[in-house]
Amino acid sequence: MRRIVTAFILSLLLIACGEAPLKEYSLEVVAEYPHDVESYTQGLFFQDGQLYESTGLRGKSTFRKVDLQTGKALERLDFDKKYFVEGSVMWKDNLYILTWDTKTAFIYDANTLEYKSTWKYPREGWGITTDGKHLIASDGSANIYFLDENFAQQRKILV
């Protein structure tokens, strides 16, 4: 009898914990823009009216300032074949670019795209962005890392 009562209570709890209906969203395509089919996009951001893209392929990684209307690169950085470029972001007048498996980060001048420095990055570089106070990076794990401009970890969160 005790098992029956326990099973009954559990079934009532399961019914009470039913899933909420899924919210549905719709979308509308308002514009389409050309894109270089040779670029394998890893990072993409739009800043101050300009589109920027980091592309990663073994031996063909680039960072590009892109003309939105034509899809053509207005400016371009080509990386050594050993680097597989991933995420990129501009913050505090710097352009930060992460590489995937070589665990390297590059810093360029955000205005001129002139090289500034290379940093050894402690993990795989995947995505990177900023909240205006920190660089925020992912490495493919369940962690998001908040970093200062020298890539020193300030905190991390589990997602």
Each predicted region: which residue ranges?
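Beta-strand-rich domains and repeat architectures in extracellular enzymes and scaffolds
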Residues: 30-62, 76-89
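A short helix->beta-strand "capping" segment at the edge of beta-propeller domains
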Residues: 20-38, 68-74
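Conserved beta-strand positions in repeat-built beta-propeller and related beta-rich domains
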Residues: 53-57, 95-102, 137-141
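Short loop/turn segments that connect beta-strands within beta-propeller blades
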Residues: 66-71, 109-113, 148-152
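Short coil/turn segments that connect the beta-strands within blades of beta-propeller domains
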Residues: 48-49, 92-94, 132-133
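WD40 beta-propeller blade core
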Residues: 61-64, 104-106, 145
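Beta-propeller fold detector
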Residues: 31-34, 74-80, 117-120, 154-159
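C-terminal motif of bacterial Sec signal peptides marking the signal peptidase cleavage site
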Residues: 13-16
